[in-house]
Amino acid sequence: MMLNATEFLTPNAINVDAVDETNAKVTLEPLERGFGHTLGNALRRILLSSLPGAAVIEAEIEGVDHEYSTLEGLQEDVLDLLLNLKGLAITMHDQNEVFLTLDKKGPGIITAADIELPHNVDIVNPELVLGTLGDRGHLKMRLRVVMGRGYEPANLRREDGDTKAIGRLKLDASFSPVSRVAYQVENARVEQRTDLDRLIIELETNGTIDPEEAIRKAATILQQQISIFVDLEAEEAPEPVKEKEEVDPVLLRPVDDLELTVRSANCLKAENIYYIGDLVQRSETELLKTPNLGKKSLTEIKDVLASKGLELDMRLENWPPADLRVDDRFSYRSR
């Protein structure tokens, strides 16, 4: 397979091997050398930190003032109960915040299925054990669930007056629906090329999103973030404004103003030399080739030019000037 040096090989095969509803292995190939790690690292970071999800950020437990309290009839410490609440896998539809309640009497095991849910909220792991109640145990609590991204420590969360109330226990929140991501890059071969990459991504979700959808969302986020570079337009530097070059006014005067002899003046006009600027650009050799113009006339011309600080065989930039009309030149022919 021969490619132009400027062309890049693009992946033409993607395989999603679903181990179960929450685990999958995604294989992408072939990739140019180095792109396996480039894409793998970027997708891994996005999967772990940028996908939206729901998590419990606050709990109010009846009879509990702080997380170091104990609740009569509950076998676990309050800290253990809060830790178990972090394992809830919650999906919310068309809502960013919701309050859930749990009211259960012992004896028995407390699971996520005991939480009362509104119609637009689901818990995908209802079998999750939250705690155990004894014969006289009674657990009544209210949970605050919000949508977010990544990991949010409780101590960095902005609080208002209500959330600072005694008895409102704050939890660190892990919003990401992806719990584990690992990738590896293997060698791949296409025809005679053996320097290619094969990217393998293994991921596990909490069940609120299937692995294939998680990969799709991560790739979409990456595409949206870098698409701005595709349309990046280089800002063209403004062209420098050229200052109008000033021409010595003497050069714009007609050769008649040199007050040469009639013979010399007529010889110059015969060669279409009408302005002093035309004259100073001629060399002695060129002028001596002019019919009827001898060395005496040449000496006269050189002396007159010297009296004005000029000489023959000068090099003038941008001559004739743009504002010197062609009509002006020909107007002297009739003189």
Swiss-Prot record:
Group of enzyme by EC: transferase
Biological process, per Gene Ontology: DNA-templated transcription
UniProt GO cellular component terms: cytoplasm; DNA-directed RNA polymerase complex
InterPro entries associated with the record: DNA-dir_RNA_pol_insert, DNA-dir_RNA_pol_RpoA/D/Rpb3, DNA-dir_RpoA, RBP11-like, RNAP_asu_C, RNApol_insert_sf
Keyword Cell inner membrane: no
Pfam hit, one: RNA_pol_L
Known function: DNA-dependent RNA polymerase catalyzes the transcription of DNA into RNA using the four ribonucleoside triphosphates as substrates.
Record text about domains: The N-terminal domain is essential for RNAP assembly and basal transcription, whereas the C-terminal domain is involved in interaction with transcriptional regulators and with upstream promoter elements.
Subunit record text: Homodimer. The RNAP catalytic core consists of 2 alpha, 1 beta, 1 beta' and 1 omega subunit. When a sigma factor is associated with the core the holoenzyme is formed, which can initiate transcription.
Protein name according to UniProt: DNA-directed RNA polymerase subunit alpha
Organism per entry: Psychrobacter sp. (strain PRwf-1)
